Design a protein with these regions (language model features):
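Conserved C-terminal structural/oligomerization subdomain of aldehyde/semialdehyde dehydrogenase
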Residues: 316-423
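Flexible, glycine/charged-enriched surface loops at secondary-structure junctions
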Residues: 37-44, 62, 184-191, 270, ...
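ALDH superfamily catalytic-core signature
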Residues: 16-18, 55, 137-141, 145-156, ...
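Short, ordered loop/turn segments at secondary-structure junctions
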Residues: 161-164, 196, 220-221, 243, ...
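Rossmann-like NAD(P) dinucleotide-binding subdomain of oxidoreductase/dehydrogenase enzymes
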Residues: 103, 110-257
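N-terminal Rossmann-like NAD(P)+-binding subdomain of aldehyde/semialdehyde dehydrogenases
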Residues: 2-121, 149
């Protein structure tokens, strides 16, 4: 029976479900080989993949150019096209990040906890999940980010990208990831790409807890929330990155130069989740600081959404196709109201306080409950590579225990207790 408001899942007989289950089965069969390969082999494969990104650059850029051309013809907005596009510089950055990840020492996978009164020794271990799924936006670099993190965590991956990036993602898997794995004796089936466009493939992926117990979901808020609901109903653990939007609070102690720098550095890209989305200004200096911020924004081609607002205060412009070049502005009465507004009106991804008064900054930091809080630093830093020196699978904004903020490979593991006889 289907109840009003219930969320339906891809039928098990559908072509999408069959294809995704087959991909998950291949990944599950490959997962023991990833675990057995060990750290040195995985790290070597990541270094080889970095080399292939550079070596195969012409083919990869050509595949991406075809995706961008098709998306442009279909009317994709500028901010989304920016996320879809691979440039030689971005390809180089992807390669560098793989090398950094390969060179990153792994944290200990086992630690001693205690001796029981009866003498047994208790240890805590981190073990691989097995197969990890990922659903992400039409953003080719995420294919590499997620695959590399999952492999570093000794698991296999099933990836589903936005349909606009399917050609780019396919090229990355076939020309870079698979050959790199094969070169070091790791099963090439360890990274699977769902070959079908449309949301049915994503819905199928979150409905296979027997094969894919953990799925990282990122992208548009509405779709991500739906997939989280479907995953919960199926028994799949979903790490969801549904909404974003950075907040910048301008305190009365902030000077013009500080405001100019933070507004500028927070808006270098408009199609990303951690960009400036909501600008809050302390009421006593609203008339003084608004023109300072406005000049920087207008120079970047960004329109200010000024009060009164017909939209929600935390409306995420990065997800509003065709309207990405907007920032919402509102006055607030002090640091506490600013922090509470940022937490209440947005996803709680990230907020920055611009202030030269340390007491004000500490007040804002203590009052804000979101994932990342910054003092005189742009929210664009809430990124796995920028913040932690590691690529990320996504940014988790849950208000529950578990990995929160940029999710990297140490977060993609299971806790296991091992009890040994007395020494």
């Amino acid at each position: 029976m289907t109840y009003p408001g219930a969320v339906s899942q891809a039928p098990e007989s559908s072509a999408e479900f069959v294809a995704v289950r087959a991909a998950a089965q291949r990944a599950a069969a490959a997962a023991p080989g990833v675990r057995a390969a060990g750290g040195p082999a995985v790290d070597a494969a990541l270094r080889t993949a970095a080399g292939l990104l550079r070596e195969k650059a012409p083919e990869l850029l050509a595949a991406n150019a075809a995706d961008v051309e098709s998306a442009t013809a279909n009317g994709m907005a500028g901010g989304l096209l920016d996320r879809l596009r691979i440039t030689p510089e971005r390809l180089s950055d992807m390669a560098t990040q793989l090398e950094v990840l390969a060179d990153t020492p792994e944290p200990p996978t086992e630690r001693f906890v205690r001796d029981l009164p009866s003498g047994e020794r208790v240890f805590e271990r981190s073990i691989p999940v097995g197969v990890i799924g990922a659903v992400f936006e039409a953003r080719p670099n995420v294919t590499i980010d997620v695959a590399s993190q999952v492999l570093k965590a000794r698991s296999a991956a099933v990836l589903r990208t936005g349909s606009a990036a399917l050609g780019s993602a396919t090229a990355l898997v076939e020309l870079v990831i698979a050959p790199a794995l094969a070169a070091h004796g790791i099963p090439t089936d360890a990274v699977q790409l769902v070959p079908l466009p449309g949301h049915a493939g994503a819905e199928a992926l979150v409905g296979l807890p027997d094969l894919v117990p953990l799925v990282v979901v990122r992208g548009s808020g509405e779709v991500t929330r739906k997939l989280s609901t479907l995953g919960a109903a199926a028994g799949t653990r979903v790490l969801a990155h549904a909404d974003g939007g950075g907040v910048l609070y301008l305190d009365s102690s902030a000077d013009d130069a500080l405001v100019e720098r933070l507004v500028h550095d927070s808006t270098d890209r408009l199609g990303v989740c951690n960009r400036l989305n909501l600008l809050l200004i302390d009421s006593p200096v609203y008339d003084r600081l608004l023109p300072v911020a406005e000049k920087v924004l207008r120079d970047r081609g960004i329109t200010l959404s000024l009060p009164p607002h017909e939209h929600a205060l935390g409306h995420e412009w990065a997800l509003d196709s065709g309207n990405e070049a907007h920032v919402t502005v509102a006055p607030v009465d002090g640091a506490v109201e600013a922090a509470l507004t940022a937490a209440r009106e947005t996803s709680g991804l990230a907020a920055c306080v611009a202030a030269t008064d340390e007491t004000v900054a500490r007040t804002f930091i203590d009052a804000y409950t979101g994932t990342g809080v910054f003092w005189n630093a742009p929210t664009r830093l809430l990124d796995g590579y920028k913040l932690l020196g590691l690529p990320e699978t996504g940014i988790n904004v849950d208000h529950t225990p578990g990995p929160r903020g940029p999710v990297t490979y140490p977060d993609l593991a299971l806790r296991q207790f091992v009890i040994l006889p007395p020494a």
